[in-house]
From Swiss-Prot:
Family label: Belongs to the peptidase S1 family.
Record-linked PANTHER family: TRYPSIN-RELATED, UROKINASE-TYPE PLASMINOGEN ACTIVATOR
Name of the protein described by the UniProt record: Urokinase-type plasminogen activator
Organism: Papio cynocephalus (Yellow baboon)
Gene that specifies this protein: PLAU
Lineage: Eukaryota, Metazoa, Chordata, Craniata, Vertebrata
Subcellular location as annotated: Secreted
PROSITE patterns: EGF_1, EGF_3, KRINGLE_1, KRINGLE_2, TRYPSIN_DOM, TRYPSIN_HIS, TRYPSIN_SER
Regulation: Inhibited by SERPINA5. Inhibited by SERPINE1.
Length: 433
């Protein structure tokens, strides 16, 4: 009976505390940050908590709920990004597996480092950008996070309605730091097209990359479509940074016409005349519209001689291809890396590819053989700067393995196919020239 009365008395105290008389300000000794106020219960003064301003949260008001980007290297980033660059969820800093790592929520300096009872990305050890622990198989790995640098997020000065197609121009300057390479956003490669194939039942899978050469035309590789040549099977996305989720401002297109090169052939390894054209049209009947994330790429000039950059030139490749040839899945985030053009004399040496490489092809590789195009990058762009304009110099075609020594990536040499492109697109307005 006494125990019951004591329990009822405790309930009365708790209820009365919840009816407006529970809060009593105490000295700010509970570590509240960002203007938070340390509070306690009127009847249980040993229980403290932080009353946070509207845009902050967390036990100590240390989480900035309004922060969507990081500054510098992100050491002081306190936002709520919680996935890595492949879309995998971060582990909580107070989870049992993370408590065995160097950085976790139970460290004496956890609050200063932004660590706590959450799984938000942080940079406690001053790496180049925010990161988190991710469960990969049986291991917990440090992975960079899907959050952009504030310096890369500046809005264009011109309103969208004033934008026009200006081939080879982009709003962001890439930071070079596919196999190796760096995750990027579509603003760095706004001409990149992601091509998917429909399956019975409604599912879609990523097939290949492509490049927007005019508002209505995307160029890619014939080998991507040779086994399934029906145009109705394909859809094309422009302005997309992630493989299986939407990007703000992206556009979706049906394929109105699919043109495969009539002289395409494939040997044991090499692909010849590996080029294709896709005429795109939205359900509303429109071609692509220029934006911060959608832009055309320049084609080589038909009147320059030579019309390709010199061997040794650094060029960019972009795609959703596998990071290693043994990987089962494609990465979720778009990747970009830099390779250098390799001379035909070198690429035709016996320990490279010998006679399999023709003058309608280009070779490109990383001098250290650490980065390369790989499975899934096919059809995507090899882009080089020519007279200040990013120019489609090659199309990802074939190669042996990925980033193997003396086995560079081989690309369709776009300059050799300009008459073919123009004869089919009949673009004479300068956008595809």
């Amino acid at each position: 009976m006494r125990a019951l009365l004591a329990h009822l008395l405790l309930c009365v105290l708790v209820v009365s505390a919840s009816k407006g008389s529970r809060e009593l300000q105490v000295p700010s000794d509970c570590g509240c940050l960002n203007g938070g106020t340390c509070m306690s219960n009127k009847y249980f003064s040993s229980i403290h908590w932080c009353n946070c301003p509207k845009k902050f949260g967390g036990q100590h008001c240390e989480i900035d709920k309004s922060k969507t980007c990081y500054e510098g290297n992100g050491h002081f980033y306190r936002g709520k990004a919680s996935t890595d660059t492949m879309g995998r969820s971060c582990l909580a800093w107070n989870s049992a597996t993370v408590l065995q790592q160097t950085y976790h929520a139970h460290r004496s300096d956890a609050l200063q480092l932004g660590l706590g009872k959450h799984n938000y990305c942080r940079n406690p050890d001053n790496r180049r950008r925010p990161w988190c622990y991710v469960q990969v198989g049986l291991k917990q790995r440090v992975q960079e996070c899907m959050v952009h640098n504030c310096a890369d997020g500046k809005k264009p000065s011109s309103p969208p309605e004033e934008l026009q197609f200006q081939c080879g121009q982009r709003t962001l300057r890439p930071r070079f730091k596919i196999v190796g390479g760096e995750f990027t956003t579509i603003e760095n490669q706004p001409w990149f097209a992601a091509i998917y194939r429909r399956h019975r039942g409604g599912s879609v899978t990523y097939v290949c990359g492509g490049s927007l050469i005019s508002p209505c035309w995307v160029v890619s590789a014939t080998h991507c479509f040779i086994n399934y040549p029906k145009k109705e099977d394909y859809i094309v996305y422009l302005g997309r940074s992630r493989l299986n989720s939407n990007t703000q401002g992206e556009m979706k297109f049906e394929v109105e016409n699919l043109i495969l090169h009539e002289d395409y052939s494939a040997d044991t390894l090499a692909h010849h005349n590996d080029i294709a054209l896709l005429k795109i049209r939205s359900k509303e009947g429109r071609c692509a519209q220029p934006s911060r994330t959608i832009q055309t790429i320049c084609l080589p000039s038909m009147y320059n001689d030579p019309n390709d950059p010199p061997f040794g030139t650094s060029c960019e490749i972009t795609g959703f291809g596998k990071e290693n040839s043994t990987d089962y899945l494609y990465p979720e985030q778009l990747k970009m890396t830099v390779v250098k053009l390799v001379s035909h004399q070198k690429c035709q040496q016996p320990h490279y590819y010998g006679s399999e490489v023709t003058t309608k092809m280009l070779c490109a590789a990383d001098p250290q053989w650490e980065t390369d195009s790989c499975q899934g990058d096919s059809g995507g762009p090899l882009v080089c700067s020519i007279q200040g304009h990013m120019t489609l110099t090659g199309i990802v075609s074939w190669g042996r393995g990925c980033a193997l020594k003396d086995k560079p990536g081989v690309y369709t040499r776009v300059s050799r196919f300009l008459p073919w492109i123009h004869s089919h697109t009949r673009e004479q307005n300068g956008l595809a020239l």
